[in-house]
Amino acid sequence: MWILLAYIALIAGINWIYEITPLVTLPGGDLWSPVDIIVGFVFVIRDFAQRRVGHYVLLAMLAGIAISWLTVSKELAFASAAAFAVGELADWAIFTATGKPFSQRILLSSLLGAPLDSLVFLTLVGLASPLAMQVQISSKLGGALLVFYLVWRREKRAAIPRGS
């Protein structure tokens, strides 16, 4: 149950932090939010939550969006809700459809979900540009890749017979 509460809190918390964190100007004048670095972990937490509670994770996503609607600007809440609807549902579908090991499902679902989420979110908040997209997607995937690697190593160690 704690994983669902963590997922809900992350959705609402990320939106609140996004709203109060100043944007960084990138070369060429594009804007980027440092919060993007931690957003990738939300995709991974969703994967852990889905592994634990199945499709109920979608209800947790709706709860996080509802809290965001009450705590941040309506523009940000709408952009976040739309991005979550597209990115997280794609992430959920890939995670559900593949019968691959957990680490691979984390990687595959993030590779699809992060770009979709970024495209929708940045477009709706008026910050979409090629550089901003690249930086946001890279930031999100960085967190997902770190967790993928850690889970993959654990799976690999667990597959090695003791005494070998």
Model-predicted regions and their roles:
Residues 19-27, 70-76, 125-131:
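Helix-coil boundary and interhelical linker segments in multi-pass alpha-helical membrane proteins
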Residues 2-4, 53-63, 101-110:
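Cytoplasmic-side transmembrane-helix entry/capping segments in multi-pass membrane proteins
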Residues 1-49:
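Hydrophobic transmembrane alpha-helices
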Residues 77-163:
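Membrane-embedded alpha-helical hairpins and interfacial helices in multi-pass inner-membrane proteins
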Residues 56-88:
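Helix-adjacent hinge/juxtasegments
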Residues 24, 45, 55, 63, ...:
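Hydrophobic alpha-helical membrane-insertion segments
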Residues 13, 66-67, 94:
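Hydrophobic residues within the alpha-helical transmembrane core of Major Facilitator Superfamily
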